[in-house]
Amino acid sequence: DALQPYAKVITGKAKTMDGFFKVHYVDGKYFFEIADSLFGRDILIVNRVVKAPVDAQKRKVGYPGDYISDEVIRFEKGRGDKLFVREISYLEHSADTLGMYQAVLNSNVQPIVATFPLKTVRKEGETTNYVIDMTDYIRKDNEMFSFTSRVKDNIGASSMVDDASYIDTLKAFPQNIEIRTVRTFQRKKGGGSGLEKLLAAFFATSTTPLTYELNSSMLLLPKEPMKPRLHDDRVGYFAVSYKDFDENPQGVKYKANITRWRLEPKDEDREKYLRGELVEPKKPIIIYIDPVTPKKWVPYLIQGVNDWQAAFEKAGFKNAIFGKEAPTDDPTWSLEDARHSAIVYKPSDIPNASGPHVHDPRSGEILETHINWYHNVMSLLYNWYIVQAGAIHP
C-alpha cells in the first residue's frame, strides 16, 4: 500500500504513549512509531507467564512469573516501504579492526524474522520516524511474543485459537515496552511431558484448550555494553559462551563472560572506591517480594536478601542489595516487567527453589532475576537437615 499522510493514520482519536519509541492506539490497532536513531540498536525481548491454566503446574511454564524465552532483535529500514526485524546472535565474536571480522560477518548473516509495510512517515528535525501496524503480529502466534516451538511441545499446545486470543494491554516506558496478551491453544494429541505422552497412549486425554496470559517486555539495551569479565573455570559463576576468532591467529578459542550485576561506584565516589573505602553503588540491586507471598514469610525473605549486604562489602560496596515489598499503589509496577527482580512465590509441591536470571548477551550484565520459591521447599530443607545433622541433633 502507498504511504498515507501521518494525520490520516495517527488521527485525532489516537491515544499516544511515549516510550523509547511512541506507541499509538487507534481504532483497536497498535502502531509503533520508530525513529531512525533506533535502527541497529539492540532490543531484548523477554517473555513470561502472567497466569497459567488450571492443570499446567507439572509443565515447563505452569506458574505466574515463569520464564518462557528471550531474544535480541534490531529494527532496520528494508527495501522499498518496509521495515525489517532481525534476530541477533552473539555466539561468534571478531573485532571490527581485525582481519577476520568481514569473514565472520559474512558467515553470520542475522535472519530477517519479520517484515512490516510502512503506514506513514514523520519528519522530526533531523530524525525520520517510521510508523508500522504491529497489531496482527503481536496478537497472532509467533516465537517473538509467544511460546517457542520447544515450549509448546512441552506444554502440549498445538495451534492457537485465533478468536480466543487477544492483546490485553500495551504500555510504553522510557527504557521498555510492556505487552500483555491472552493466548489460547488447542491441545496437541499425545503432547506434553513424557508422562503425559505415555498416559495418552493408553487413556483418553483432555481436549480442553489451554489459555495462558503472557507478558512480553521489550528492553532497549545500553548503546555501550558493560565491560565484560572473562570466566575462570576455577570460580563458580554462570557464564555466556562464544567463539573468539581473534585471540588465536591460527585457530578458534572458545571463551565465556561471567554473568554479573552492574555494580559501579558513583562518579563522585570513584576515588574513594579505588582507595578501598566502602561506597554505595550507582544502582543497588533491588529484589522485590511477590505480592501474593503469604505475609508471614515476607519479613524473613526480605531479611534473607539483606543478609547478602555483607558479601558485597567484600567487593567494596555498602548497601548494595535490598529486599523490598512490591509496591501496591503503583499502577505501572508489574511482577513480569523485565526491569524488576523478584522472589516469586509458587504454590507448588516441588521441594526446591531456583534463581534464573536474564542477562545482556553482549556483556553478561544481569538485567533482572526471578527467584522461584516453591511452597514445598521446606520439606527439602528438613530432609537436608535430617541427613546432615540428624545424628548429632540433641
Outline where the language-model segments fall.
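Sec-exported extracytoplasmic/periplasmic mature domains
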Residues: 306-317
